[in-house]
Amino acid sequence: MSQTWLTAHDDEPMRGLPAPLPAAETLLWQGSPDPLSLAQRAYGVRAVAIYFFLLLALRLAEAGSGELAMNGWMAELVPTVVLAGCATALLGLLAWLNARETLYTLTDKRLVLRFGVALPMTVNIPLTRVEAADLRLYRDGTGDIAFRLSRPERVSWLVFWPHVRPWQWTRPQPCLRGIRNPARVAELLREAAAADSGIPGSA
């Protein structure tokens, strides 16, 4: 597994790749995270919105019970509403930027993850280094595909986030987050891995 640090995507010899594909390698699929899916499941926009909603409901309940004076509860609510709007907007913007700068590439030999807003990075993961792939589907039609790497291969959770499987800190797993048509991508991955060396596990 190799890592290549890039300064600009405009310099890519082939979109999403640090170098042109060898003649014997075939491009199977390219895609990016869905911004809404990434915002909800990686950046926690929904959880933050629910938190502020409950906080506002509590403030309104206190106002209705007379614990806050009428001229005081508005002063309590307005900053909370503004903070809620700023927090969700900021997280949504970060998710959108991350999705825009991310490109996942699958060939018949490897996976290539290009990601990073401030510091773009490209990572090549040969299919022969993948022990298993796990597919998770969501009701909005998007999904995640996480990869368990063979030892001693490791990735940094901090460097790869949010392109890692959630809650896997001790042995982080690279993950295609919030991709559209994930079942089809998983099938392409299964076929490519089977043709290359075989990949046990689910996808």
Give the predicted meaning of each segment.
Residues 23, 53-54, 124:
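Long, distal/terminal scaffolding or interaction modules
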Residues 87-132:
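Conserved beta-hairpin
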Residues 2-31:
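Short, charged cytosolic
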Residues 2-4, 139-203:
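A membrane-cytosol interface segment of integral membrane proteins
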Residues 31, 108, 149-151:
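Flexible glycine-/small-residue-rich
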Residues 29, 111, 185:
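Residue-level signature of catalytic and energy-coupling elements of molecular machines
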Residues 36-101:
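Alpha-helical transmembrane spans
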